[in-house]
Amino acid sequence: KFRGAFSAISALTSGERDKGILAYSSGNHAQGIAMAATMHNIPSTVIMPEDAPKIKIDNTRKLGAEVVLYDRYNESREVIGENLQKKFGSVLIKPYDDPNVIAGQGTAGLEITEQAKDLGIDEADLLVCCGGGGLTSGIALACAENAKNFKVRPVEPAGFDDVVRSLISGKRETNDSNSSSLCDAIVTPSPGILTFPILKEFCYPGMVVTECEVLKAMRIAFERL
């Protein structure tokens, strides 16, 4: 998330920087924006759900951002963002529907393809955790250019498989806003407007994982990585 935030903030003009930065996020984009904005000496405000993990809210504040909390079940972060934008004139940097965010996150894909080449790997299925699709679409673009035999597959938690279903139907599907998941960082209502055409063109069929599979993967990561 820091890659995308830093990329987007670096692309701002001096006039845009003077207006300050506004973002909305469940936690990771929030921290990326806060850190990148502080590094550029730009004030930032981040809209976060009140039920986001406390550590993410606290860290976002510690990294320098002002945090505005909202009720994700009864309020729209987009509407809150639009109102704050009109009031203060801040520049809104979306968590995935921003070309510079996608480009920044795509650098992870460039590193993956470069490291794979060094290891002699020229064909693989690349599984990418997916919410709105910023990271996944960025990696997919990088692979399409530099590792054409890599198959990028979005991976989503059960109950929030909007991208997987959207790739099947060919149109943007939505999730039930009343559901919950261990994977709070990738709980999004639907694929991004900018990201979905990229996902549709460059990604292969996605995968859906259960809460039990998520916990098992976390345990393996702690034990072996």
Predicted regions and their residues:
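PLP-dependent amino-acid enzyme catalytic core
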Residues: 2-225
